[in-house]
């Protein structure tokens, strides 16, 4: 076994290699938490805009907007996150979500199984309290390590 100091150092080293991002189906919870205006929320919901939120330096920031039905947006998002990348560690990838339709989660998993990156493990997890409280239900993300 490793010492507490060794575990801490390894966790700190890996923190800089983590990529975490999410797609939100609706902006209701972002609005309720004061993270977007009512106009932004209504416009996004009416136009079926689904923002991608990336976790960078411990903070969440919007990076890209997708438009359309949630399942197709999820598939486009996964392709965008992984396309043409040679720095993704193919050992393990997480599908993390907040109360998503199991069929949507399954569609993402099937896409990852067919992807050019041969992931050794695809793990499905429930999102933590921070993502859940900020983003609300029907939020899905993929998390992985860079090499």
Task: Annotate each PLM feature.
Residues 1-147:
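Mixed-charge interfacial surface used for oligomerization/domain docking
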